Regions:
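Polybasic, low-complexity RNA-engagement segments
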Residues: 1-40
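A structural signal for short, well-ordered beta-strand segments and their strand-loop junctions
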Residues: 2, 61-65, 140
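Non-catalytic substrate-recognition/targeting regions of SAM-dependent transferases
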Residues: 7, 12-13, 18-20, 42-116, ...
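Hydrophobic (often cysteine-bearing) scaffold residues that line and stabilize catalytic clefts
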Residues: 38-39, 114, 169
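Conserved SAM/SAH cofactor-binding pocket of Class I
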Residues: 123-183
Length: 183
């Protein structure tokens, strides 16, 4: 779930920040350099809010990711675990469908949270047509994480053909299909 989206320009001074929840982990992404003092302040705010809403005894788990060139030049890690832990394997559920995610590796976590409405549409479309005479066939021309394909199959599509950008996507698709008992 997208918790905060500063890049939309609705929060002046916060345009560089995005906060996503991949339960039980929060991922804070900055598109501009962030100082340790800023991260400490944000971490304290997250901890304060988490202590108010968390199930009893549940620790705050959060990761910071900087998506900018300055991090590579300075030699600092692009992605850092700031508090708690990240499960391995890390599996999240959206609308009853399970996905394996990787919040400590690169920019592609395995599920683009801002595409949830699109996945709902694909699910509803596939479910409504799953009993058609010939069955629904889906061509996914941008199968980056295969999440749309998993949703289509889960909703009753007869066949999905994926076009991948990289070989790694095949492994992601296979893991997600297995998690959802899809052959």
């Amino acid at each position: 779930q997208r918790v905060f989206h500063g890049r939309g320009g609705l929060f002046p001074g916060c345009e560089q920040w995005v906060l996503d929840a991949y339960p039980p982990v929060f991922v804070l992404t900055s598109f501009a350099p962030a100082s340790d003092a800023e991260l400490e302040t944000i971490g304290e705010a997250l901890q304060t809010r988490w202590s108010q809403i968390a199930p009893e005894g549940e620790p705050l788990n959060w990761v910071f990711q900087h998506r900018g060139e300055a991090v590579r030049i300075e030699g600092r890690s692009e992605t850092r675990l700031m508090a708690g832990a990240v499960p391995d394997p890390h599996v999240v559920t959206e609308a009853g469908v399970r996905y394996r995610v990787h919040v400590l590796r690169g920019q592609n976590h395995g599920l683009f949270l801002d595409m949830a409405a699109g996945r709902r549409w694909v699910h509803d479309y596939a479910a409504a047509r799953s009993q058609d005479r010939y069955g629904l066939k889906v061509l996914n021309l941008f199968a980056y994480t295969c999440a749309f394909s998993v949703v289509a199959l889960e909703a009753g599509a007869k066949q999905v053909v994926n076009v991948y950008m990289s070989h790694g996507a095949i492994g992601i698709e296979q893991q997600n299909n297995k998690l959802n008992s899809i052959n």
